[in-house]
Regions:
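Conserved catalytic cores of phosphodiester-cleaving nucleases, focusing on short active-site segments
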Residues: 6, 42-50, 58-67, 80
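Acidic-basic catalytic patches of nuclease active cores, encompassing PD-(D/E)XK
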Residues: 1-29
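Short, solvent-exposed loop/turn segments that connect beta-strands within catalytic domains
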Residues: 52-57, 92-95
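A short glycine/serine-rich beta->alpha loop
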Residues: 30-32, 64-70
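Nucleic-acid nuclease catalytic cores
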Residues: 68-120
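Phosphate/oxyanion-binding active-site loops and adjacent basic polyanion-contact surfaces
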Residues: 2-3, 37-42, 72-77
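Active-site metal-binding core of divalent-cation-utilizing nuclease and nuclease-like domains
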Residues: 22-52
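Intrinsically disordered, low-complexity terminal regions enriched in charged/polar residues
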Residues: 105-151
C-alpha cells in the first residue's frame, strides 16, 4: 500500500529523533480480547520501550494506514486504541492517554483516548511539512513519560 510507504519512514524518524528509546511495530497480530472484537492486525504501533523483538507496554500510539478516505479508518483505529489501553492494563503499565492517527501518507488525522473518552481532532494535517507531523508524534511519545512509570 502506497500510504504505508510514506508513513513508515515518518515513524522511523520519530524513533531516531527519540534516540531509539521507543519501538515501532508494523503489521503484527494484536489479539487482546476476541470476545469483544479486540483482535486483528494493526498497521503501526509505537511503544514506550526500546525492545524491538516483541511488543512491550506501554503501547502509546496506533497508526492506521488508509488508501484514500481517512474517515473510513477512524473506527478501526479507535478499536485498536482501546486494545492498546487494555494491553497496557493487563501488563500493569497504565498510561492516561493512548493516541491514534489515521493517514493516507499525505493527510493525517489524530485521535486521543483518555480513560473512556475519545476525542477526534477534526483538522486534517498535510504532509509536507513533515516537521509538524514529527512534532505531534514526539509529543505523544514524551507526554506523561515520567508519570507512566509510577501509575
Amino acid at each position: 500500500m502506497r500510504s504505508e510507504g510514506i508513513i513508515y519512514p515518518v515513524l522511523l524518524e520519530v524513533r531516531r529523533i527519540l534516540d531509539r528509546q521507543i519501538s515501532l511495530f508494523s503489521g503484527e497480530d494484536f489479539t487482546i480480547d476476541e470476545a469483544v472484537g479486540l483482535n486483528g492486525v494493526f498497521d503501526f504501533l509505537l511503544a514506550r520501550s526500546s525492545e524491538v523483538l516483541e511488543i512491550e507496554a506501554p503501547a502509546v500510539v496506533i497508526v492506521e494506514a488508509k488508501k484514500t478516505d481517512l474517515k473510513s479508518g477512524l473506527g478501526q483505529c479507535i478499536a485498536e486504541m482501546v486494545a492498546a489501553q487494555r494491553f497496557n492494563q493487563v501488563k500493569e503499565k497504565n498510561i492516561p492517554i493512548i493516541y491514534g492517527s489515521v493517514s493516507n501518507g499525505i493527510q493525517w488525522q489524530f485521535i486521543k483516548l483518555e480513560n473512556q473518552i475519545v476525542t477526534i481532532d477534526l483538522s486534517v494535517y498535510p504532509l509536507p511539512p513533515v516537521e509538524q507531523i514529527l512534532s505531534f508524534f514526539i509529543f505523544m511519545m514524551q507526554n506523561d513519560a515520567i508519570d507512566s512509570e509510577t501509575i
